[in-house]
C-alpha cells in the first residue's frame, strides 16, 4: 500500500458514524494534523456535497451601540477597561439603522447583523432592539443580533420581533476560556445559547484564532462548536485583529496556513453550516482568501467596518469575487 493510500485510509477512519454528533478533541486534532493539501481537498469535497462552491452569503455588520462594555475580553477594543481610543456611543437612531440596512441590501447583502456592546441587555433594551429588528426585517433582509447574555424570555421577544439569527460566540477552547475572559464563563455562553435555541432562533456561533492558543486549543474550539446539538447554522471564524491598548495587542501572528486549516476543519466537522470569514480579513491576501473559499468558507462580512475594526472595501470584495467567479446568494437562496 502506498504512503498516500495509508493517509487516505487514516483520514477516512477519522469520520464519525453518520448518526454520531460528538467529535472528540483528539479526532479534531488529527484533522488539523493532516497534510495541508489532503485536508483542503477533503474539506472541499464535503463542501461540494452540501453547497454550491461558487456561492457566497454576504452579511453586513453594524454596531448599533458602541463601547463602554463591562466585560474584560482581552481581544476587544470595546471594553471599558482598556484605553483603545474607542468612544462610547449610545444607541443609534432607528431611521439611521434602516438607512444603513437599505444600503447594505442594495449592495448585495442578504443578512443585516446588528451588534451592541453590552454584557447583557436590559428589558428596555430588548424593546428598543425589537423595534429596530421589525424595521430592518420589513426590508426583506435576514436579521442577526449580538446583544450579549440573555435573561429568560428575551430570546422569545427577539424571535417575535422577527430576528432570524442570534450571534453568541464561544470565543476559544473551553479549557482556556478563563485565560482570555474573566468576567464570564464558558458555561454562561452555553446558557444563553440554550435560551436562543429553545426560542426557535437560528444560531450564529464561532470563535477567534490567533490569541496565542496552541493547535490543540484551536481543535478544542472547533470541537466545542461542532458538538452543539444541533450545530450552528452559521459559524464565523475570526482572526484576531490586534488593537493597541488591549491585553492581546502583542499576540504572536498566526501562520496563514493554520488559519486555512481552521476553516477546513470547521467545514469537515460542521458540513451543513455556513462558515464565515469574519474579522481579520483585511489583513488576508487574496490568495489566502481564495484558499479559504476552496476549504469550505462560504460567507463573508461585506462592508468597510466590522463593529470597530477595519474590513476590506466593498469594491475590493467585488473584484475578488469576480476573479474567483463567485456570486452572492440572495435572501431567497439562504436557508
Swiss-Prot record:
<feature type="binding site">
    <location>
        <position position="113"/>
    </location>
    <ligand>
        <name>[2Fe-2S] cluster</name>
    </ligand>
</feature>
<feature type="domain" description="Radical SAM core">
    <location>
        <begin position="54"/>
        <end position="281"/>
    </location>
</feature>
<keyword id="KW-0411">Iron-sulfur</keyword>
<comment type="subunit">
    <text>Homodimer.</text>
</comment>
<dbReference type="GO" id="GO:0004076">
    <property type="term" value="F:biotin synthase activity"/>
</dbReference>
<feature type="binding site">
    <location>
        <position position="276"/>
    </location>
    <ligand>
        <name>[2Fe-2S] cluster</name>
    </ligand>
</feature>
<feature type="binding site">
    <location>
        <position position="204"/>
    </location>
    <ligand>
        <name>[2Fe-2S] cluster</name>
    </ligand>
</feature>
<dbReference type="InterPro" id="IPR010722">
    <property type="entry name" value="BATS_dom"/>
</dbReference>
<feature type="binding site">
    <location>
        <position position="69"/>
    </location>
    <ligand>
        <name>[4Fe-4S] cluster</name>
    </ligand>
</feature>
<keyword id="KW-0093">Biotin biosynthesis</keyword>
<keyword id="KW-0949">S-adenosyl-L-methionine</keyword>
<dbReference type="GO" id="GO:0051539">
    <property type="term" value="F:4 iron, 4 sulfur cluster binding"/>
</dbReference>
<dbReference type="Pfam" id="PF04055">
    <property type="entry name" value="Radical_SAM"/>
</dbReference>
<dbReference type="InterPro" id="IPR007197">
    <property type="entry name" value="rSAM"/>
</dbReference>
<protein>
    <recommendedName>
        <fullName>Biotin synthase</fullName>
        <ecNumber>2.8.1.6</ecNumber>
    </recommendedName>
</protein>
<dbReference type="Pfam" id="PF06968">
    <property type="entry name" value="BATS"/>
</dbReference>
<keyword id="KW-0479">Metal-binding</keyword>
<feature type="binding site">
    <location>
        <position position="73"/>
    </location>
    <ligand>
        <name>[4Fe-4S] cluster</name>
    </ligand>
</feature>
<keyword id="KW-0408">Iron</keyword>
<keyword id="KW-0004">4Fe-4S</keyword>
<keyword id="KW-0808">Transferase</keyword>
<dbReference type="GO" id="GO:0009102">
    <property type="term" value="P:biotin biosynthetic process"/>
</dbReference>
<comment type="pathway">
    <text>Cofactor biosynthesis; biotin biosynthesis; biotin from 7,8-diaminononanoate: step 2/2.</text>
</comment>
<dbReference type="InterPro" id="IPR002684">
    <property type="entry name" value="Biotin_synth/BioAB"/>
</dbReference>
<feature type="binding site">
    <location>
        <position position="144"/>
    </location>
    <ligand>
        <name>[2Fe-2S] cluster</name>
    </ligand>
</feature>
<dbReference type="InterPro" id="IPR013785">
    <property type="entry name" value="Aldolase_TIM"/>
</dbReference>
<dbReference type="GO" id="GO:0005506">
    <property type="term" value="F:iron ion binding"/>
</dbReference>
<comment type="function">
    <text>Catalyzes the conversion of dethiobiotin (DTB) to biotin by the insertion of a sulfur atom into dethiobiotin via a radical-based mechanism.</text>
</comment>
<comment type="similarity">
    <text>Belongs to the radical SAM superfamily. Biotin synthase family.</text>
</comment>
<dbReference type="InterPro" id="IPR024177">
    <property type="entry name" value="Biotin_synthase"/>
</dbReference>
<keyword id="KW-0001">2Fe-2S</keyword>
<dbReference type="InterPro" id="IPR006638">
    <property type="entry name" value="Elp3/MiaA/NifB-like_rSAM"/>
</dbReference>
<dbReference type="GO" id="GO:0051537">
    <property type="term" value="F:2 iron, 2 sulfur cluster binding"/>
</dbReference>
<feature type="binding site">
    <location>
        <position position="76"/>
    </location>
    <ligand>
        <name>[4Fe-4S] cluster</name>
    </ligand>
</feature>
